[in-house]
Amino acid sequence: FPAMPLSSLFANAVLRAQHLHELAADTYKEFERAYIPEGQRYFLQNAQSTGCFSEVIPTPANKDEAQQRSDVELLRFSLLLIQSWLGPVQFLEKAYANELVFGTSDRVYEKLKDLEEGIQALMRELEDGSPRAGQILKQTYDKFDTNMRSDDALLKNYGLLSCFKKDLHKAETYLRVMKCRRFVESSCAF
């Protein structure tokens, strides 16, 4: 992110987060369509709702809770969520090498790195300007399993994609809340 006005930094970060969240949601839906029998979807979705690693990070659960946090806190949460996926996403391409729909996974990593840099640029702007070492995650998500013939691998990857979608939704929400707080505009209703 080159030097630019704060409003542009926020606008770019929100657009990137929104795009990644849409990509994660589309990938999840496509995986579900391709691999999960329709009769099992509801049961499996409920079973995975508590299995996300990010739930151990004390992040705001919704927009109202996010509005009660400072911008710097929300940026830190967003950064932690993004960084927790940098490693696992690199295995998406390997897990789905022969699947056309998952062919964008190599770009997902680049897009996550780009969003990470954007969030770090916002943190530098909002803090005292000096780069601070962020909280380093000792634990992240498991890698995606490349053995697509195994039911266990399918269920694991389905759960990971569900968490990926949820975490990117959180990061997008936090960035939107901050942007709307600072720059009131018509697109703040979400």
Swiss-Prot record:
The protein's superkingdom reads Eukaryota
Which residues participate in Zn(2+) binding?
H19, E172
Q: Which GO terms describe its molecular function?
A: growth factor activity; growth hormone receptor binding; hormone activity; metal ion binding
Give all Phosphoserine modified positions: S105
Q: Where in the cell is it found?
A: Secreted
- Record-linked InterPro entries: 4_helix_cytokine-like_core, Somatotropin, Somatotropin/Prolactin, Somatotropin_CS
In terms of SUPFAM superfamilies, this protein maps to: 4-helical cytokines
Task: Fetch the Pfam families from UniProt.
Answer: Hormone_1
Q: What does this protein do?
A: Plays an important role in growth control. Its major role in stimulating body growth is to stimulate the liver and other tissues to secrete IGF1. It stimulates both the differentiation and proliferation of myoblasts. It also stimulates amino acid uptake and protein synthesis in muscle and other tissues.
Q: Give an example GO biological process.
A: growth hormone receptor signaling pathway
List the GO terms this entry assigns under cellular component, sorted alphabetically.
extracellular space
Family under the similarity heading:
Belongs to the somatotropin/prolactin family.
Q: Which organism is it from?
A: Balaenoptera borealis
Q: What is this protein called?
A: Somatotropin
Keywords, alphabetical: Disulfide bond, Hormone, Metal-binding, Phosphoprotein, Secreted, Zinc
Predominant location of this chain?
A: secreted
Disulfide partners: C52-C163, C180-C188
